[in-house]
Amino acid sequence: DAAMNDLLRPALYKATHGVSNLKDKKENARNWNIVGPVCESSDFLAKNVSIEAEEGDYIAIKNAGAYGFVMASNYNSRPRACEVLIGGNASSLIRRRETFDDLLELERIDD
């Protein structure tokens, strides 16, 4: 769900974030590049990370909160991702995902 418009730091200045599979798989890990759907050659969220993953798994990009939303944009007409606060065993949705209608809401064309 995420792309460089949601987490710009890796594309902008090669910042790194921890990456993990939420299913907590540890066997048969391989090296992966975690990329987003934006049609840019710099849309990497992580490069060469060793995790086990398969289609349908959820991958966490860790410690992204401090600069996530404030550096995020609607580049490529992409709504910004939701934000989830995780502490211990609890999680809470603290900002909902934007919708395409949210993007259009700010547009005006005068006659």
Regions found by a protein language model. Name each.
Residues 1-111:
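Charged (often Lys/Glu-rich) extended helix/loop segments that serve as interaction or gating elements
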